[in-house]
């Protein structure tokens, strides 16, 4: 696939070629190409290399003073010259990742209709429920291999954004390419526009989505089913990633489709995989195993419960029983600790309740155990925040944990930054530098008592691009829990702290390509072992992954007729 030295035969010419983001080279078109593609006079005289173009683009990028303007600028480059966009992002990955994705993408979703410049991907509204096949045929990219789809109901920690949620599939697929080497020609972002219950969006005259309360129940389920069937007819081998669906839909959709099509839910499974990988690295750095930990969650939604189930599976793989593993995991939501007999729990929450026999000797002034009560009685060694509620990891909570645990592992994972349960600076100060910290959004290193503590970003971008690369390279037909487990273990093996005893918990973003390839290999090996892909040798698998990995370089063009 990575045949950059071979010419590419294309039928477009003139303004049509310059208006095609996947093919446009701008000032990098050669003299010969300008002649044969009717570009003479349409471009300045100078012929530039991609590095010269990137240098100019970076200077322009630096001229913008706020992150939203930088985001809009980068999206404009993406919509005019994709090769240049990805070269620019790869050259400045640590700087630009927070701009093209979290945390800036959250504000971009909230303001989607106000900053809209050009359509990208597909907007499939409920009004067109009987024409989904036609809409898929209208996609700009026709050789689609990976789809990221959302209905916009639970965008990060920001709630229902309607079609504004399209910013998430666009951003996620940009990371599939920038981090995982998936060609942008093979990607398709989709938003299922089933209305919105956000009164601000409905009242906004600029809102571009379907102005209607959200479709729910059987009508909603049937619409999603029609969409999945249409995708299967159009691109039967495509990987489908569900993204930012509300809790009431996320888990049921995953359960319905995970054994029917090649799909996964990044909020549930991707978040779980990167968290388990980070925990494995933290445990290794602390000289212990995951099965020895007592883990408390703040947030018992689909993401938190998905992480918990993945942790339990890893604990069991280390030799303890399922019952023992579940007794070491404590789920806390707004009503307190999930316990036997609690009303109105969802099925996936019921599997994670604490049995009464495990809490019968606990001391508390309230019948529902609070987070502080859990800290005091369970004495957890790991604390994970997926609540979307800022500031709930208070000084009292963290210091109570530190009383019983010399090196607490604290992961406030809520996105964006404004929703984080506690800042790394506070956690480091409250534990006198003893906590191992990873966050969902990027944070600067923390200085405390003369030491600098790098803060790992426990971000799904370390996981899902590698999963996608592994699945697509061997045309795997499913994404299984075991494949995801292998991705966690592969990520843990890349941890500087676990390997060297110093540095960050997770590798720097500058190493993301090697990390993604390592994860891809582990995921693909497990897929082959489980019979979800044709068997090949390890050497051939490495070659497939390398050959599949797209690089942002300009191809030579030759003209062909329509």
UniProtKB/Swiss-Prot annotation:
Keywords, alphabetical: Metal-binding, NAD, Oxidoreductase
Protein name: NAD-dependent malic enzyme
Named cofactor requirement(s): Mg(2+); Mn(2+)
Recorded family membership: Belongs to the malic enzymes family.
Site (Important for activity): 267
Binding residues for NAD(+): 154, 267, 415
HAMAP family from the UniProt entry: NAD_malic_enz (MF_01619)
Cofactor note: Divalent metal cations. Prefers magnesium or manganese.
Residues of the active site: 101 (proton donor), 172 (proton acceptor)
SUPFAM superfamilies found in the cross-reference section: Aminoacid dehydrogenase-like, N-terminal domain, NAD(P)-binding Rossmann-fold domains
Gene Ontology BP annotations: malate metabolic process
E.C. designation(s): 1.1.1.38
Listed Pfam families: malic, Malic_M
Residue sites binding a divalent metal cation per the record: 243-244, 267
GO CC annotations on file: cytosol
């Amino acid at each position: 696939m990575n045949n950059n030295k071979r010419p590419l035969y294309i039928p477009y010419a003139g303004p049509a070629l310059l208006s095609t983001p996947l093919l446009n080279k701008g000032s990098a078109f050669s003299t010969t190409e300008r002649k044969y593609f009717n570009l003479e006079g349409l471009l300045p005289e100078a012929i530039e290399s991609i590095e010269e173009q990137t240098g100019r683009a970076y200077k322009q990028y630096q001229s913008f003073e706020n992150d939203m303007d930088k985001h809009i600028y980068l999206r404009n480059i993406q919509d005019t010259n994709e090769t240049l966009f990805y070269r620019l992002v790869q050259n400045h990955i640590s700087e630009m990742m927070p701009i093209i994705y979290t945390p800036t993408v959250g504000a971009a979703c909230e303001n989607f209709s106000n900053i809209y410049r050009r359509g990208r991907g597909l907007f499939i509204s409920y009004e067109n429920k009987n024409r989904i096949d036609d809409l898929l045929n209208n996609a700009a990219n026709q050789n689609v291999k990976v789809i990221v789809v959302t209905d916009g109901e639970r965008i990060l920690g920001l709630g229902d954004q309607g079609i504004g949620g399209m910013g998430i599939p666009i951003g996620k697929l940009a990371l599939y390419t920038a981090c995982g080497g998936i060609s942008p020609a093979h990607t398709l972002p989709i938003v299922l526009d089933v209305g919105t219950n956000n009164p601000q969006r409905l009242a906004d005259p600029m809102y571009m989505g379907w102005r209607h309360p959200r479709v729910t129940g059987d009508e909603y389920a049937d619409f999603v089913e029609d969409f999945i069937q249409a995708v299967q007819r159009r691109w039967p081998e495509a990987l489908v990633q569900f993204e930012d669906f509300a809790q009431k839909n996320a888990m049921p959709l995953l359960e319905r489709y995970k054994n029917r099509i090649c799909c996964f839910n990044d909020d549930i499974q991707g978040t779980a995989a990167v968290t388990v990988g980070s925990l494995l690295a933290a445990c290794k750095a602390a000289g212990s195993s995951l099965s020895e930990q007592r883990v408390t969650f703040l947030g018992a939604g689909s993401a938190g419960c998905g992480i918990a189930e993945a942790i339990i599976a890893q604990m069991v793989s280390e030799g303890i029983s399922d019952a023992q593993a579940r007794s070491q995991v404590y789920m806390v939501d707004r009503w307190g600790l999930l316990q036997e007999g609690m009303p109105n729990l969802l099925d996936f929450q019921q599997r994670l309740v604490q049995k009464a026999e495990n809490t019968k000797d606990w001391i508390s002034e309230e019948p529902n155990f609070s987070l502080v009560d859990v800290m005091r009685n369970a004495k957890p060694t790991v604390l994970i925040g997926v609540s979307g509620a800022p500031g709930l990891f208070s000084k009292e909570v963290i210091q109570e944990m530190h009383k019983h645990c010399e090196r607490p592992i604290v992961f406030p994972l809520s996105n964006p930054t404004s929703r984080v349960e506690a800042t790394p600076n506070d956690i480091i100060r409250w534990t006198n530098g003893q906590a191992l910290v990873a966050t969902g959004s990027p944070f600067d290193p923390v200085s405390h008592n003369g030491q600098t503590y790098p803060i790992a970003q426990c971000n799904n971008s370390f996981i899902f691009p590698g999963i996608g690369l592994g699945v697509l390279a061997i045309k795997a037909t499913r994404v299984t829990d075991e494949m995801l487990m292998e991705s966690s273990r592969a990520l843990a093996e890349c941890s500087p702290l676990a390997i060297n005893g110093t540095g960050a918990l997770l590798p720097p973003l500058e190493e993301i390509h090697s990390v993604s390839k390592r994860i891809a290999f582990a995921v693909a090996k497990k897929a082959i072992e489980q019979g979800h892909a044709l068997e090949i040798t390890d050497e051939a698998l490495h070659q497939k992954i390398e050959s599949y990995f797209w690089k942002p370089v300009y191809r030579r063009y030759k003209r062909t007729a329509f």
